[in-house]
């Protein structure tokens, strides 16, 4: 299915024909819940977010090589996908109505997925350059100080909701973390390693088998590509030490005032456990938002890292970089440009 449908209604690729066939096959992007409506809710239709992406982005990954216009904003891709979805509803259901609330329920996840896919493809370009010395992208620009070094390949990994970061640790590192956990539990305390939305990792050398998947870009955001993106972290479990963690990214379209401190807490915990308990280098923590309106994100995210204050010397921010992630290409380029700065 195309990102934008043929405007000729008689064409075989016109939306009425495509959406009707999709719905008839049981692969539609909407679920009619009017019959089995949840008590106390007025929801009539629910969006199947995987199918929305599978339909709208079955030919390219936004902001990367293969995208007909990689300069577009995240918002433009999502707006077109939702327009396709609304039209599909009008084609397939009488009395169709889709509330903005239903769109909002999937919007953040789709935004995060698009960013993760763009970063994945940027990392694949980087890894090819590390191995061959050839820059094979026309969308991304090679960081001028990047030195092709096969041992400096990276994996930029989308973590699953509720995933356990400690599962990525090898046996020795997990034992160190477990000893730390047990010591706290003996005093009735805990400090769990949080799971960010996206992790940037140095691929171990020699490369474990599960990392081979990060050498190739995703061609699109079909269901198959989404599954790769969502499940890749499970294939690299039990492989990492603290030194392999480069950066973490919290991805949100926006953040409410009552959620401001969640990222700050996650950043401090990650930096303490990875830097002190597991004796890795200083991990960097990024917050990527589409808008900072509605809360004092800029002011609050100037907070110093508690770890750097306790260590003395020059303090650092808990959240190293607050970035307005408006376009997938620019967002991925920013991360690419930072990769040469990691000493190890």
Task: Enumerate the language-model features and the residues they cover.
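C-terminal tail/extension regions appended to the core domain(s) of diverse proteins
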Residues: 1-109, 113-140, 258, 275-344
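Acidic-basic catalytic patches of nuclease active cores, encompassing PD-(D/E)XK
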Residues: 94-220
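Conserved catalytic cores of phosphodiester-cleaving nucleases, focusing on short active-site segments
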Residues: 198, 247-251
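Short, well-ordered amphipathic alpha-helices
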Residues: 198-203, 264-274
């Amino acid at each position: 299915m195309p990102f934008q449908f043929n405007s000729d209604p008689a064409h075989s690729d016109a939306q009425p024909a495509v959406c009707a066939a999709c719905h008839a096959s049981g692969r539609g992007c909407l679920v009619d819940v009017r019959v089995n409506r949840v008590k106390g809710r007025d929801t009539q239709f629910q969006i199947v977010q995987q199918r929305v992406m599978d339909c709208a982005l079955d030919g390219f990954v936004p902001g990367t090589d293969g995208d007909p216009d990689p300069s577009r904003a995240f918002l433009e891709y999502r707006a077109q996908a939702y327009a396709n979805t609304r039209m599909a509803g009008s084609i397939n259901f009488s009395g169709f109505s889709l509330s903005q609330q239903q769109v909002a329920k999937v919007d953040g996840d789709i935004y995060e997925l698009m960013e993760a896919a763009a970063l994945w493809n940027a990392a694949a370009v980087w890894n090819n350059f590390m191995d061959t010395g050839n820059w094979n992208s026309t969308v991304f620009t090679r960081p001028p100080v990047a030195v092709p070094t096969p041992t400096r390949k990276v994996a930029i990994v989308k973590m699953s909701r509720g995933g356990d970061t400690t599962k990525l640790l090898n046996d020795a590192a997990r034992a160190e973390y477990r000893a730390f956990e047990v010591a706290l539990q003996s005093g009735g305390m805990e400090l769990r390693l949080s799971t960010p939305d996206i992790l940037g990792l140095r691929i171990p050398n020699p490369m474990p088998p599960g990392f081979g998947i990060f050498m190739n870009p995703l061609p699109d955001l079909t269901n198959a590509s989404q599954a790769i993106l969502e499940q890749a972290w499970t294939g690299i479990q039990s492989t990492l030490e603290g030194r392999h963690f480069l950066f973490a990214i919290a991805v949100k379209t926006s953040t409410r005032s009552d959620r401001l401190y969640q990222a700050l807490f996650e950043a401090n915990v990650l930096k303490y456990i990875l830097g002190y308990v597991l004796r890795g280098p200083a991990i960097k923590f990024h917050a990527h938002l589409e808008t900072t309106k509605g809360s004092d994100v800029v002011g609050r995210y100037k907070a110093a890292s508690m770890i750097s204050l306790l260590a003395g010397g020059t303090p650092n921010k808990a959240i190293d970089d607050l970035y307005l992630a408006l376009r997938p290409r620019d967002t991925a380029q920013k991360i690419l440009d930072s990769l040469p700065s990691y000493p190890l």
